Amino acid sequence: MTQLSSNDVPSMGRRQFMNLLTFGTATGVALGALYPVANYFMPLRAGGGGGGTSAKDELGNPVTKTGWLATHQAGDRSLVQGLKGDPTYLIVNEGGEIGEFGLNAICTHLGCVVPWDSGANKFICPCHGSQYDTNGKVVRGPAPLSLALAHVDIEDDAVLVKQWSETDFRTNENPWWA
């Protein structure tokens, strides 16, 4: 058996450093991979005790009631970023106030964003022609289901979008999206 010279054997300090570097790198990668999973199950909430998500405009700024009503008239249906970042329609009712519900703008057929057609007074999907009435109820397929509902609340002038889990008032059935 041959003996290695002391120059060929790495010092304990260098070995410990390499072990620490390897462990630190592996830990960093593992924690980085777990962050999106943890964020999915425990999403960040908007300020306030209600637990809603702050509606955001096309620039990512929080929507306020006074700012929204200053630029949107009665009957308007315009997109904001709502729950889970999905495009959501805020509805200004005929009384000039923001409605108590919003509509998720994702078509229930293939997931296209459904634009509001003010001339036809309904939502018409550009992908396959599904149509939804003013409240998001499907009136013409191939979409099988109505647009998902979301609660819209005003807290200190901030517009909050919250999960809808009650009976769907359009169909009197349990919500398919909850």
Swiss-Prot record:
It is found in: Cellular thylakoid membrane. It is an enzyme of class 7 (translocase). Disulfide bonds join 112-127. Residues 65-161 form the Rieske domain. The chain crosses the membrane at residues 20-42. Its cofactor is [2Fe-2S] cluster. Keywords: 2Fe-2S, Disulfide bond, Electron transport, Iron, Iron-sulfur, Membrane, Metal-binding, Thylakoid, Translocase, Transmembrane, Transmembrane helix, Transport. [2Fe-2S] cluster binds at residues 107, 109, 125, 128. GO terms for molecular function: 2 iron, 2 sulfur cluster binding; electron transporter, transferring electrons within cytochrome b6/f complex of photosystem II activity; metal ion binding; monooxygenase activity; oxidoreductase activity, acting on paired donors, with incorporation or reduction of molecular oxygen; plastoquinol--plastocyanin reductase activity. GO terms for cellular component: plasma membrane-derived thylakoid membrane. Binds 1 [2Fe-2S] cluster per subunit. It is a single-pass membrane protein. It holds the Pfam family TM_PetC. One of its GO terms (biological process) is photosynthesis. InterPro entries: Cyt_b6_f_Rieske, Rieske_2Fe-2S, Rieske_2Fe-2S_sf, Rieske_Fe-S_prot, Rieske_Fe-S_prot_C, TAT_signal. Its EC number is 7.1.1.6. It catalyses: 2 oxidized [plastocyanin] + a plastoquinol + 2 H(+)(in) = 2 reduced [plastocyanin] + a plastoquinone + 4 H(+)(out). Belongs to the Rieske iron-sulfur protein family. The Rieske iron-sulfur protein is a high potential 2Fe-2S protein. The 4 large subunits of the cytochrome b6-f complex are cytochrome b6, subunit IV (17 kDa polypeptide, PetD), cytochrome f and the Rieske protein, while the 4 small subunits are PetG, PetL, PetM and PetN. The complex functions as a dimer. Component of the cytochrome b6-f complex, which mediates electron transfer between photosystem II (PSII) and photosystem I (PSI), cyclic electron flow around PSI, and state transitions. This is Cytochrome b6-f complex iron-sulfur subunit.
